[in-house]
């Protein structure tokens, strides 16, 4: 069953990666809007026809909502470790994303100065300077890189925009290390396509990309919830550990989540 978030701000909930996480969903509460259609996405498949007129929260509405949530949580055991942008699709698609990040930083500093601000993004808009600059301001700029080859990225992420992998890696390099790379490892099938980003060839290409990007951290993980594509295999913790060791051999920080 697909998980869709019904509120602009939700939680806090416990995150495997980010601790006590106060979620932010900038996309409509009625459906998913994303430039990827990942075979493993907990929000399910993209709708055939996205509602381009779906109402998005204004910066003023977002500020009121986040202010109320943080004021209520301040000084309690539920005070968040992270204010996390995820939700029903790609958060950077919101037309006021840069302004919303500035609002979040100001309210975080006021109510929860120990909390980090995290953005989970597929990275398809980092070529836009406004988006790049906004992501560069947050504590955890978490960008997706799910395979070493463009062929496997297209099979796993099913993008509805054209991805130039060389340009994407070059854009990630411009963060000068102020980026966290997230990768979900998976095997399976989708239609006639064989999905496997764990092959020796894919792993080697992926590692070469990491060397160029030099991320502050790499997060690797496996399927944890129901997926829209049913023919997927959850990678074992032992195999994930072996991949993590290859990242460590590059003298890069890595965390893995079974």
Located regions from the model:
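Short hydrophobic-acidic sequence motifs that mark active-site Asp/Glu residues
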Residues: 21-23, 82, 142, 180
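Conserved Radical SAM active-site core
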Residues: 40-137
């Amino acid at each position: 069953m697909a998980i869709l978030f019904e509120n602009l701000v939700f939680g806090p909930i416990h995150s495997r990666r980010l601790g006590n996480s106060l979620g932010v969903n900038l996309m409509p509460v009625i459906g998913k809007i994303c430039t990827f259609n990942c075979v493993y996405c907990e929000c399910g498949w993209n709708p055939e026809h996205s509602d381009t007129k779906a109402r998005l929260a204004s910066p003023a509405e977002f500020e009121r909502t986040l202010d109320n949530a943080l004021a209520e949580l301040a000084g309690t055991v539920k005070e968040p470790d992270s204010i996390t942008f995820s939700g029903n699709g790609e958060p950077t698609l919101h037309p006021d994303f840069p302004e919303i990040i500035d609002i979040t930083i100001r309210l975080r500093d006021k109510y929860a100065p120990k909390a980090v601000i995290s953005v989970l993004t597929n990275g398809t808009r980092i070529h836009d300077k406004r988006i790049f600059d906004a992501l560069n301001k947050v504590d955890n700029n978490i960008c997706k890189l799910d395979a070493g080859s463009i062929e496997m990225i297209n099979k796993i992420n099913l993008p509805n925009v054209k991805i130039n992998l060389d340009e994407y890696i070059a854009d990630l390099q411009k963060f000068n290390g102020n980026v966290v790379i997230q990768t979900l490892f998976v095997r399976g099938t989708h239609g006639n396509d064989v999905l496997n980003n764990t092959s020796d060839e894919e792993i080697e290409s992926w590692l070469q990309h990491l060397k160029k990007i030099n991320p502050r951290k790499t997060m690797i993980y496996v399927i944890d919830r129901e997926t829209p594509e049913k023919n997927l295999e959850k990678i074992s913790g032992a195999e994930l550990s072996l991949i993590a060791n290859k990242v460590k051999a590059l003298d890069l920080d890595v965390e893995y989540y079974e």
